[in-house]
């Protein structure tokens, strides 16, 4: 939304002159960051506040692959930040794709909510600006998060929705994009036994 001499919901004053003057450059940056999400994260990361954190090279490659390709598969050992990278990649796809409905399917039902909340809290700790991409719910003032016993959902200001569910849930069947966090433990993945 463009307001003359007014503040928009992300805390930035945006005028018609600014859109006319800088719109082309902003569009180019958004296109670049949509393909290089790791560069966007570097641009918004506060190195003074969070000196000990930097994406590892394989995380940057994975984020770029998630942003560009329809099908991506990684095989990685324990401790390689697979879940963190998947949740971060999903969040960024929703940021750069207005109206996207994305679903992340986790293997274990009991830990879906706890893991999702933990990973998104970690993401917001490293990149606090990302939390401003979420809607504020009118009913309780929470920052764009809906939780239930079997799903965790983030609602974005650009009308994207990111839902984290367990493999046993019927939610997420009509999404634009589905990510399987752990395909090894899921029966009949890709039409054959795992």
Where do the language-model regions lie?
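Phosphate/NTP-binding elements of NTP-utilizing enzymes
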Residues: 1-194
């Amino acid at each position: 939304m463009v307001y003359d001499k007014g503040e928009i919901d992300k805390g930035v004053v945006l005028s018609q002159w600014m859109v006319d003057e800088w719109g082309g450059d902003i569009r180019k940056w958004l296109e670049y960051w949509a393909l290089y999400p790791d560069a966007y994260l570097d641009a918004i990361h506060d190195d003074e506040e969070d000196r000990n954190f930097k994406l590892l090279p394989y995380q940057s490659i994975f984020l770029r692959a998630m942003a560009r390709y329809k099908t991506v598969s990684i095989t990685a050992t324990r401790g390689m930040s697979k879940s963190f990278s998947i949740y971060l990649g999903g969040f960024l796809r929703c940021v750069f794709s207005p109206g996207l409905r994305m679903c992340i399917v986790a293997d274990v039902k009991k830990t879906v909510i706890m893991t999702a909340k933990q990973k998104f809290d970690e993401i917001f700790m490293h990149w606090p600006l990302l939390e401003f991409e979420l809607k504020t719910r009118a009913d309780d003032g929470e920052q764009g998060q809906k939780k239930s016993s079997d799903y965790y959902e983030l609602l974005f200001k650009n009308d994207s929705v990111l839902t984290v569910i367990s493999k046993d849930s019927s939610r997420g069947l009509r999404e634009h994009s589905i990510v399987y966090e752990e395909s090894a433990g899921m029966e009949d993945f890709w039409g054959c036994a795992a």
